[in-house]
UniProtKB/Swiss-Prot annotation:
Record's keyword terms, sorted: Electron transport, Heme, Iron, Membrane, Metal-binding, Mitochondrion, Mitochondrion inner membrane, Respiratory chain, Transmembrane, Transmembrane helix, Transport, Ubiquinone
Gene: MT-CYB
Membrane topology reported for the UniProt record: Multi-pass membrane protein
GO molecular function, one term: metal ion binding
Family (UniProt): Belongs to the cytochrome b family.
Binding site for heme b b566: H97, H196
Protein name: Cytochrome b
Record note on quaternary structure: The cytochrome bc1 complex contains 11 subunits: 3 respiratory subunits (MT-CYB, CYC1 and UQCRFS1), 2 core proteins (UQCRC1 and UQCRC2) and 6 low-molecular weight proteins (UQCRH/QCR6, UQCRB/QCR7, UQCRQ/QCR8, UQCR10/QCR9, UQCR11/QCR10 and a cleavage product of UQCRFS1). This cytochrome bc1 complex then forms a dimer.
Organism: Marmota broweri (Alaska marmot)
Effect seen on changing G340E: In strain: Isolate USNM 583155
Location within or outside the cell: Mitochondrion inner membrane
């Protein structure tokens, strides 16, 4: 008799995705981040749901409702800090997941890759709106500065900003709509994740060698389920250490001051995971140019399938490309550091150089190095 999991209309979908899925036998720990991102999304949705039960999206009470959650709600402090630090874990996993895709050439599955880039945009939008909700100083001024960037749009800019604000400044209408969007976007992200997996399972997973692995596949369960569980345990361990020992390590002290439109913080900056893009934005003196550079810094990922000129898929056997890749990683870390500094000498110069290097590596240096490697291999 055929096993129920193989014939039941609903269960067989799960079976083909997580149980009997043929997976390459040599995928490393770098392939764990997909499942960890799923876990992060689940944690964020559940903690967010419980926070939404106690939060009020009104400028008069938003800040005190967050304080109320931390002080008066049973384990409210735990839920709030799991949600805040869960976002940081989410982005750490996202950056590592994207980095793995770049290193091992997973972007050659262009549909999966492009859906992934759209997911990255959606998660960044969700995180930005979530940062506004506690209605502290950095929430208010971050929202003002970032939404104001849209005014750089030719002709319709000012109208567009006022339309998003729901008035002539960031106020009650802005907070209410940001809360609404912040609540609904994770469910849209979950739907996009399904599409991401659908396209992935059409082609099967890539592997570190970048070679076709059809002749050497093993079932996902139990081999990779146990591997994913280990990753999940480590992720939760790191998250809980962060939450229980230093929950405000990655936050901004300014956000413990209620929003005040009459008092600008000394240094307005977003959360740490946006600092690299913020540094690119600030490195261009022109407003519209900065906004375009900011958008293109993420959108450029969609060009990876087109810019792949190497005869080999993975960087595993391409030492020159590996060097350039790690320079790119160092450059992104530099941009993150610069984004957190004030705009003065020498930080502004370093930021401009790092921004130029970022685009140069992706658009020029990596494709050129790939062609050189092809020549060295007499291909």
């Amino acid at each position: 008799m055929t096993n129920t999991r193989k014939i039941h209309p609903l269960i067989k979908i799960i079976n083909h995705s997580f149980i009997d899925l043929p997976a390459p036998s040599n995928i490393s720990t770098w392939w764990n981040f997909g499942s960890l991102l799923g876990l992060c999304l689940a944690i964020q949705i559940f903690t967010g749901l419980f926070l939404a039960m106690h939060y009020t999206s009104d400028t008069m009470t938003a800040f005190s409702s967050v304080a109320h959650i931390c002080r008066d709600v049973n384990y409210g402090w735990l839920i709030r800090y799991m949600h805040a630090n869960g976002a940081s874990m989410f982005f750490i996993c996202l950056f590592l997941h994207v980095g793995r895709g770049m290193y091992y050439g997973s972007y050659t599955y262009s549909e999966t890759w492009n859906i992934g880039v759209i997911l990255l945009f959606a998660v960044m939008a969700t995180a930005f709106m979530g940062y506004v909700l506690p209605w502290g100083q950095m929430s208010f001024w971050g929202a003002t500065v970032i939404t104001n960037l849209l005014s750089a749009t030719p002709y319709i800019g000012t109208t567009l900003v006022e339309w998003i604000w729901g008035g002539f400044s960031v106020d009650k209408a802005t907070l209410t709509r940001f809360f609404a969007f912040h609540f609904v976007l994770p469910f849209i992200i979950a739907a996009l994740v399904m599409v991401h997996l659908l396209f992935l399972h059409e082609t099967g997973s890539n592997n570190p060698s970048g070679l076709i692995s059809d002749s050497d596949k093993i079932p996902f369960h139990p081999y990779f389920t146990i591997k994913d569980i280990l990753g999940a345990v480590l992720l939760i361990l790191i998250l809980m250490i962060l939450v229980l020992f230093s929950p405000d390590l990655l936050g901004d002290p300014d956000n413990y001051t209620p929003a005040n439109p009459l008092n600008t913080p000394f240094h307005i900056k977003p959360e740490w995971y946006f600092l690299f893009a913020y540094a690119i934005l600030r490195s261009i003196p022109n407003k519209l140019g900065g906004v375009l550079a900011l958008i293109f810094s993420i959108l450029i990922l969609m060009l990876f399938p087109l810019l792949h000129l190497s005869k080999q898929r993975s960087m595993m056997f391409r030492p020159l490309s590996q060097c350039v890749f790690w320079i790119l990683v160092a450059d992104l870390i530099t941009l993150t550091w610069i984004g957190g500094q004030s705009t003065e000498y020498p930080y502004n110069i370093i930021g401009q150089l790092a921004s130029i290097l970022y685009f140069a590596i992706i658009l020029l240096i990596l494709p050129t190095i790939s062609l050189i490697e092809n020549k060295l291999l007499k291909w």
